[in-house]
């Protein structure tokens, strides 16, 4: 009888103890952060929640007590793509499949440890941190650090990984990675930290009459019948420049000054522009002179809009002379020039309701030597001129008024040429 009474007392005490600490948990689409906050308040442990953690949790009728609350917490997070990994502080990483291929931190999980922090993060595992992680600043002295940044990233990624950040205020790169990679990275940055040559582009853009060309034979310092690169015969060069079909040549020496004098002294020729550009090798240089002209792109009147408030849309475009050159200095003293030159003008014709522009453009890529002059041309434009003259009052007399009026038509065909000289300015 005493034995039965003792067992009854023990069973009653156990039931009372379990009932006191067991708690049914039901979560219906509750936020993850609320679940983590509930766990922290029940256990008294610190919990860190990653800012990227989002989503909701659903749990139905789970009995949780002090003995299984940690397992319950981990199980719920795992079921929702989150996993608690022990540490000091503990870190939660995913995906679980990736964690399975690495040493499991859950083997050292200590349910009884106090002050352990848990971090809940989404399904993205951070890259492994090198054991000899170090941070170093590399100063770049001859080029921009932003130009070196892509190459430095490729080098670091191919040698164990790391992080490279551009510090433009100091023109330097801040690199974090393995200490073993830093010496090789320093040598690599030094090898590409080399000042680039600059190229001075001098140009003469001019136009001449098709019927009466300008004679540049003296300026080009070539005898009659001489040859230049490309097989361009300079016999009677003035006639050659006025011939339709274009011209091309590469000449030794800077002949722009003499050519400018020859064009200015010729009454049938006109200097359009003499642009000069200084730019680095591999960088584009651009210069433009002209007008910003409004062009009507749309108009709304009548039924499409209120008659009292008609409107039209206007787009402004640059009309004038522009030169864009991208030089690349080669190792053998050669230069590769990508040239885009344009000469636009407003037409005097009024056959449309909007503005008409005359366009002449040359786009090409050539290779010349340092100091040589390039001739491009053959862009012909035709201008039609109509003029009416009359004697006031007398021209309006019936029958004989035509004797005091005159009408003339004229046509002027002009060809545009471009002379371009490139000089390499060596880095100090």
Curated annotation (Swiss-Prot):
Which residues, if any, are the signal sequence? Answer: 1-22
InterPro entries per UniProt: Bact_Secretion_Sys_Channel (IPR050810), GspD-like_N0 (IPR049371), GspD/PilQ (IPR001775), NolW-like (IPR005644), NolW-like_sf (IPR038591), T2SS/T3SS_dom (IPR004846), T2SS_GspD_CS (IPR004845)
Gene Ontology cellular component terms for the protein in this record: host cell membrane; membrane
Give the membrane topology, semicolon-separated if more than one: Single-pass type I membrane protein
Q: Which family does it belong to?
A: Belongs to the inovirus G4P protein family.
Write down the species: Enterobacteria phage I2-2 (Bacteriophage I2-2)
Q: Report which superkingdom the organism of origin falls in.
A: Viruses
What role does this protein play? Answer: Acts in the assembly and extrusion of the bacteriophage by forming a channel across the host outer membrane. This channel is just large enough to allow a newly synthesized phage particle to pass through. Extrusion is a process of concomitant assembly and secretion and takes place at specific assembly sites where host inner and outer membranes are in close contacts.
Gene Ontology terms: biological process: protein secretion; viral extrusion
Task: State where the protein is found.
Answer: Host membrane
Sorted UniProt keywords: Host membrane, Membrane, Signal, Transmembrane, Transmembrane helix, Viral extrusion, Viral release from host cell
Subunit architecture: Homomultimer. The channel is composed of 14 G4P subunits that confer a barrel-like structure. Interacts with G1P; this interaction results in a complex that spans the inner an outer host membranes.
Q: Can you say what this protein is called?
A: Virion export protein
């Amino acid at each position: 009888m005493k034995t039965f009474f003792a067992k009854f007392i023990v069973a009653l005490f156990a039931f009372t103890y379990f009932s006191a600490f067991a708690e049914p948990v039901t979560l219906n689409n509750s936020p993850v952060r609320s679940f983590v906050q509930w766990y922290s308040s029940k256990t008294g442990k610190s919990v860190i929640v990653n800012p990227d953690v989002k989503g909701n949790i659903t749990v139905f009728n789970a009995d949780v007590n002090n003995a299984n609350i940690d397992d319950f917490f981990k199980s719920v997070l795992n079921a929702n793509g989150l996993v608690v990994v022990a540490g000091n502080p503990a870190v939660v990483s995913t995906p679980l499949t990736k964690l399975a291929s690495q040493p499991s931190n859950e083997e050292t999980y200590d349910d009884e440890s106090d002050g352990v922090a848990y971090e809940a993060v989404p399904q993205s595992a951070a890259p492994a941190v090198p054991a000899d992680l170090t941070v170093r600043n590399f100063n770049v002295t001859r080029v921009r650090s932003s130009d070196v940044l892509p190459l430095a990233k490729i080098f670091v990624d191919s040698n164990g990984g790391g992080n490279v950040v551009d510090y433009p205020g100091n023109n330097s790169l801040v690199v974090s990675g393995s200490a073993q990679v830093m010496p090789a990275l320093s040598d690599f940055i030094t090898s590409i930290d080399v000042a680039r040559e600059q190229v001075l582009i001098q140009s003469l853009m001019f136009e001449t009459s098709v019927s009466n060309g300008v004679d540049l034979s003296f300026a080009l310092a070539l005898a009659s019948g001489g040859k230049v690169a490309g097989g361009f015969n300079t016999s009677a060069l003035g006639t050659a420049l006025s011939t339709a079909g274009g011209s091309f040549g590469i000449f030794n020496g800077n002949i722009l000054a003499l050519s400018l004098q020859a064009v200015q002294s010729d009454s049938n020729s006109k200097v359009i522009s003499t642009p000069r550009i200084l730019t680095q090798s591999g960088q584009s240089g651009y210069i433009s002179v002209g007008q910003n002209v409004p062009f009507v792109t749309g108009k709304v009147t009548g039924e499409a809009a209120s008659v009292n408030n008609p409107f039209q849309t206007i787009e402004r475009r640059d009309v004038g002379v522009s030169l864009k050159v991208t030089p690349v200095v080669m190792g053998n003293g050669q230069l590769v020039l990508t040239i885009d030159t344009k000469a636009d003008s407003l037409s005097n014709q009024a056959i449309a309701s909007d503005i008409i522009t005359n366009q002449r453009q040359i786009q090409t890529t050539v290779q010349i030597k340092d100091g040589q002059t390039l001739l491009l041309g053959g862009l012909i434009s035709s201008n039609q001129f109509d003029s009416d003259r009359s004697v006031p009052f007398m021209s309006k007399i019936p029958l004989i008024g035509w004797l005091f009026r005159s009408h003339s038509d004229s046509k002027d065909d002009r060809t545009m040429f471009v002379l371009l000289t490139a000089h390499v300015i060596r880095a100090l």
